[in-house]
């Protein structure tokens, strides 16, 4: 991955602010779709079984990159999905976790943030389970890397 490449278009703080600003869920869903459209497309060669997230109804791929201290590396992520809303959820997950040390990622439960903005409560059970699978995969990977 080239240095300085942006992995997502909006920061988590910006996403939270936008969610608070938007009044109804129809507008919020459109916003999630827009976040997905802004997400760089994952290269075809990275859409491998190893990068596929299990537990998602849609196809979702996550690729992890690390840099810095091998004992507590900074982790960044690329991701993609074949479904519009899920692609937006991938963008939110990447905004939440990318660019942080592995130990911080392992300790950060994104579902507290997602609940605060009402995201989890307004997703179908399939999408909510997929979101949980993405978060679980990232946090488990971070725990392994932080313990290395």
Curated annotation (Swiss-Prot):
Name the InterPro entries on file: Fe-S_metab-assoc_dom
Its ancestry begins with: Bacteria, Pseudomonadati, Pseudomonadota, Alphaproteobacteria, Hyphomicrobiales
Look up the coiled coil feature and give its residue ranges.
none
- Classification via Pfam families: SufE
Q: Which organism is it from?
A: Rhizobium etli (strain ATCC 51251 / DSM 11541 / JCM 21823 / NBRC 15573 / CFN 42)
Q: What is this protein called?
A: Uncharacterized SufE-like protein RHE_CH01250
Q: Say which family it is in.
A: Belongs to the SufE family.
